């Protein structure tokens, strides 16, 4: 499970929100990037009797278009904006940095401007890639960021825009999220059906995190005023090779796995 640190105190998201933090009226929730794995998970676990939901994807709304985003926000006036939209393919970000910054940074800026203008709370989904990853101990919310990739730098820029434009924000950094859609788990399962051998990085460490668990902590936080930056993952740590081993074991699939360094891995890190 995920344990959130709220103002220096541990609070279990499975416990009821204190009465003074509850919202009296139905929340109007705008989920941006709703068809992705986190957006889909939020829609699966939320209570439709508690929340009115607006779902948008790039087909309905271009978050890089400031006027389009402002018009949608002002017309619909959400209570909460959850930004799940992002370019997460690290290789694509390196090849097309302009695209990465437009979506991951400017998109977050535009949504946070709407949040400030309408008084909405803003949830920004971020990543552990805002750190350099060279440390052998876990990073905290108070550590300095130092991204080494275009993806990480663009996501940090998005965080900074959110902090600049609205104080009513929740920035959630997570990693190794799995759920519906294109992710490491599903790529391992696909490889097991199409290959005899798979090379997996054993020098990358993280905490595999259920998209549904992450969705639940988001839905918990938006009912509070505990604004700030959070590291939100499931408990436990492993490397990519160990993660793939467990995925195949649980799925009952057989394929030869070989531990390698990241540069030799068959699968991208996203």
Residue ranges with predicted function:
Residues 87-90, 95, 128-149:
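Active-site "gating" loop of Rossmann-like NAD(P)-dependent oxidoreductase/epimerase domains
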Residues 154:
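Active-site helix of classical SDR
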Residues 160-208, 213, 219-220:
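NAD(P)-dependent short-chain dehydrogenase/reductase
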Residues 217, 224-268:
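Mid/C-terminal beta-alpha module of Rossmann-like enzyme folds, strongest
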Residues 66-103:
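NAD(P)H-binding glycine-rich loop region in Rossmannoid oxidoreductase-like domains
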Residues 95-123:
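NAD(P)-cofactor binding segment of oxidoreductase domains
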Residues 29-45:
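N-terminal Rossmann NAD(P)H-binding glycine-rich loop of SDR-like oxidoreductase domains
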């Amino acid at each position: 499970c995920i344990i959130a640190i709220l103002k220096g105190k541990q609070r279990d998201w499975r416990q009821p929100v204190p009465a003074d933090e509850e919202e009296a009226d139905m929340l109007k929730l705008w989920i941006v990037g709703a068809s992705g794995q986190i957006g889909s998970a939020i829609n699966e676990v939320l209570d439709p009797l508690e929340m009115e939901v607006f779902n948008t994807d790039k087909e309905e709304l271009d978050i890089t278009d400031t006027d389009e985003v402002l018009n949608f926000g002002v017309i619909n006036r959400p209570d909460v904006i959850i930004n799940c939209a992002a370019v997460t393919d690290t290789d694509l970000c390196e090849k097309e940095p302009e695209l990465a910054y437009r979506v991951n940074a400017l998109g977050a800026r535009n949504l946070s401007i709407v949040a400030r203008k309408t008084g909405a709370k803003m949830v920004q989904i971020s990543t552990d890639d805002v750190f350099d990853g060279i440390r052998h101990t876990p990073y905290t919310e108070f550590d300095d960021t130092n991204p080494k990739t275009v993806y990480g730098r663009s996501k940090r820029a998005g965080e900074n825009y959110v902090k600049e434009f609205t104080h009513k924000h929740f920035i959630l950094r997570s990693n190794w999220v799995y759920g519906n859609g294109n992710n490491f788990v599903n790529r391992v399962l696909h490889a097991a059906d199409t290959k005899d051998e798979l090379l997996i990085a054993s020098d990358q460490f993280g905490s595999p995190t259920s998209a549904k668990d992450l969705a639940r902590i988001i839905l918990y936080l938006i009912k509070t005023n505990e604004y700030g930056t959070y590291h939100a993952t499931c408990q436990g740590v492993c490397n990519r090779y160990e993660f793939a081993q467990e995925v195949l074991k649980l799925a009952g699939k057989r394929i030869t796995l070989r531990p390698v360094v990241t540069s030799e891995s068959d699968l991208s890190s996203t």
